[in-house]
A protein has these predicted regions:
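Low-complexity, serine/threonine/proline-enriched polar segments
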Residues: 75-85
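Gly/Ser-rich helix-loop-strand patches that form or flank binding pockets
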Residues: 4, 117-162
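Short glycine/proline- and acidic residue-enriched helix-loop micro-motifs
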Residues: 62-74, 99-100
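Small/aliphatic-rich secondary-structure junction motif
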Residues: 1-68
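General small-molecule cofactor/ligand-binding pocket signal
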Residues: 35, 101-105, 159
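Structural beta-alpha unit
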Residues: 84-126
Length: 162
């Protein structure tokens, strides 16, 4: 049975656990489609040199949703390294590489809102994310990404992995 799964990651230990969980649960399903998704922080174009701007602009040709946004190349490199490790974990769990994709966004919304928007636009059946390590006091005042996603997600199952 076709099953679309969005795994929201940030390179943390808890997002690695979310990837491991997804591998255990969805490896038996040859029709599962898993997408690793990360939000990079947006920065001002003024903080980049001409070569960095040129590199980022060339990457945006295929991604009109990123028009006008800029990010640090080293953040993208770190993300791509994690994506590679996560894909390897999923393959080791029994998934085929063709079942796994990766995608990123650049923060123009709050991270939770960006995850929710991607989940809705991609029509995912399941959304998996790791629990963040906020203290109870900070979580009470600020909320957390996982709390907001659980509260506001519609039309999909949400799994928060600790």
């Amino acid at each position: 049975m076709l099953h679309n799964v969005l795994i929201a990651v940030d390179g943390s230990r808890n997002s690695r656990r979310a990837v491991e969980y997804a591998g255990r649960v969805f490896a038996p399903n040859p029709e599962a489609r898993l997408v690793l998704f990360q939000i990079l922080p947006a920065i001002s174009r003024m903080n980049l040199d001409k070569e960095e701007i040129k590199t980022i602009d060339s990457r945006k040709v295929e991604r009109p949703d990123l028009a006008g946004l800029y990010w640090r190349a080293e953040d993208e490199d770190t993300m791509n390294k994690f994506f590679g490790e996560a894909k390897d974990l999923l393959v080791q769990a029994g998934l085929k590489r063709e079942q796994i994709k990766s995608k990123f966004g650049v923060k123009k919304l709050e991270i939770a809102d960006a995850i929710l928007q991607e989940a809705e636009l991609g029509k995912y059946d399941t959304l998996i994310l790791g629990k963040r390590g906020l203290s109870r006091v900070r979580e009470f005042f600020l909320g957390s990404i996982s709390t907001k996603v659980v509260r506001e997600a519609r039309g999909c199952a949400v799994v928060v992995v600790e």
